[in-house]
Amino acid sequence: MALLQIAEPGQAAAPHQHRLAVGIDLGTTNSLVASVRSGQSVILNDEQERSLVPSVVHYGVEEKKVGLEAFEQASLDPKNTVISVKRLIGRSLSDVQSRYSSLPYEFVASENGLPLIITAQGSKSPIEVSSDILSRLNHIAEQRLGGELSGVVITVPAYFDDAQRQSTKDAARLAGLNVLRLLNEPTAAALAYGLDSGQEGIIAVYDLGGGTFDISILRLSKGIFEVLATGGDTALGGDDFDHLIADWIIEQTKLKPQTANQQRELITLANQAKITLTNEKSAVISWQDFSVEISREQFNELIYPLVKRSLLTCRRALKDANVESEEVQAVVMVGGSTRVPYVREQVGEFFGKTPLTSIDPDKVVALGAAIQADILVGNKTDSDMLLLDVVPLSLGIETMGGLVEKIIPRNTTIPVARAQEFTTFKDGQTAMTVHVLQGERELVDDCRSLGRFTLRGIPPMAAGAAHIRVTYQVDADGLLSVTAMEKSTKVQSSIQIKPSYGLTDEEVTAMIKSSFDNAQEDLQARELAEQRVEADRVIESVIVALQADGAELLSTDEFHHIETVLKQLMDVKLGSDRDAIAQGIKALDTATQEFAARRMNASINKALTGKNLSDIENP
């Protein structure tokens, strides 16, 4: 049954009218902007013909600088120079402080607990900093294209959660941009390679940027890009390589940076050494009157644990996709950190084939985003290309007994809408709380709560008579909205899930692993909970029936017998013996069968009293 008709946003009213649109790779280290010109996706350079815009903003006393000019201030004024803001967006202050305690900035909490960075120009949120970077990219694009943009596609890591995605959209809107879609970075890369190389089959997209890592397993067939599975780590990237080299320098020289400026200078030297080692066998580093040499072999040893960590994530993604490594026909390398020879070597060994690097790994994401932007803005209305991303964790709802009913399973392609009908538990129930959950476990306590809302105005009916339709909808940006509607009155309530901060990828992985490790125990716990819910339902209905008709239809002995069996079920329900509860339910059913028959007869007699046969035959 079709629940939702998806229409692409921003379709041009006139097919012949060309509209200006760009793809933006909002990266941790660098950002890029691209557009389709004369049928080809190209990077738009700045005034100095530079393609990469460092994702850095400097808030000086008198002026604000973005890009390379800001990056040059990093070692001179680190407290007012914000770098790698992508790591901070959509996170809580406590999360930022625990994860990134080495950052030179001073943080304060906003009213809703999100981090604000204290600068010479006042407190700045990660959304505002990202907005300044996007404004710079917008300026470059409009200067190059000679007009105002109709829309943009912005890429995000596949593992960005709702809060991080929504924060990215908020930053774009603050910059005055019309967001056509947020697109997963690996999907954008696959789009670029799919068009240029015409490849079909299973493809792995290994994306190692400055601050994030993503792996996506995709199936490309006849213009359809389907993401079979994703995995990632929002705290793994080339920045971590730099910090490992910096730690090695400290160990070799026995000197520790004493100031934030020295720390930033050390990181810069480490980054330069990493770049040198991409093409050379060794690199010489001069630090505070000391000169040390690091070989490529030493560098490989330093980064081995991080590269291995990324490959373990690849293994999990293959398992999720139900794909063997030998089935992967091509491996696409994305992100500047994939230039490191050891990374390419290890990825090649893992998948058993040489990775594809024909498109600049720094540019491939932006180029793919530009292609999608050109389609969405209406310049390619004849395109039959379809992009299918997936939800990384199952989305469900709490039911009676603290159970989780999954509405949208993990790895379902998006956009998607799924609906399911629920009913009331008690007679006369006029409201229902919808508790939205995320995770793979069977019980509410073991899953992540995303939000709650209450549907009011349900007509009072007997338990089980009301029909409440709950619809879960995940849009193309991965944002979730939930609607509950009572079918007879059409009264409804809804919520858009917008958490204040999100899960780390380690937590996502742990949640998935936990569901496997506890599968048997979870199933037993679910069966016990379901039996308790059924016992509660039976107990409730018998108590109501006894109160209404027990004195009239039952003898004293019959009444006491039912009460005794009822009490036995209430006692056994408190235990954890599922079979004993089932036997108690059966015993109560047997004890009340005659009572139920008498109630039915009494109800029929009452309905027929005072009516003729003709009234019944011709109502």
Curated annotation (Swiss-Prot):
Keywords assigned by UniProt, alphabetized: ATP-binding, Chaperone, Nucleotide-binding
Mention one GO biological process in which this protein takes part, according to its record: iron-sulfur cluster assembly
| Gene3D superfamilies noted in UniProt | 1.20.1270.10, 3.30.420.40, Actin, Chain A, domain 4, Substrate Binding Domain Of DNAk, Chain A, domain 1
* Top-level taxonomic group: Bacteria
InterPro entries for the chain = ATPase_NBD, Heat_shock_70_CS, HscA_NBD, HSP70_C_sf, HSP70_peptide-bd_sf, Hsp_70_fam, ISC_FeS_clus_asmbl_HscA
One GO MF term attached to the UniProt entry: ATP binding
Per the record's keyword annotation, is DNA repair included, yes or no? Answer: no
Pfam families hit by this protein: HSP70 (PF00012)
CDD domains xref list: ASKHA_NBD_HSP70_HscA (cd10236)
Keyword Chaperone applies: yes
Which SUPFAM superfamilies does the record associate with it? Actin-like ATPase domain, Heat shock protein 70kD (HSP70), C-terminal subdomain, Heat shock protein 70kD (HSP70), peptide-binding domain
Q: What does this protein do?
A: Chaperone involved in the maturation of iron-sulfur cluster-containing proteins. Has a low intrinsic ATPase activity which is markedly stimulated by HscB.
The similarity comment for this entry is: Belongs to the heat shock protein 70 family.
- Protein name as annotated: Chaperone protein HscA homolog
This protein's species is: Haemophilus influenzae (strain PittGG)
